Amino acid sequence: NLKDELNKYEAEGMNVTVTMYQPVRYQTDSTPNILADGTRIKTEQASKYKFIAVSRNLLKRWGGWLDYGDFILLKGTSHKDGVYQVKDTMNARFVNRVDILESPGVKPYKFEKAQILKTDIFASK
């Protein structure tokens, strides 16, 4: 059932496609410095934040297993593995996808078979 499947993803992670996006109007909306959860960023320092956008099917709001503010461990990307925080939402056309927030000028990249796993190691209590 769906609940068991969501619990499995939360416990074991899942495979996703990883891409990147930049806080610029043509890739976001008219307020590229404000993320979906309301966080305001300095666009020129976007790469320093370690924030990600996730496809809607991964967010609890749309039946997924992640929430804004959750920390995920990303593996399988060669040079982008690490812990990121969920802060933004991708366009509805994407499924099972993670977008890493990068500063303007960073060369685009894509990883087809990366894995995300929810972690609370870095969550502040």
List the predicted regions and their residue ranges.
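Solvent-exposed, well-ordered loop and adjacent helix/strand elements within mature globular domains
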Residues: 1-125
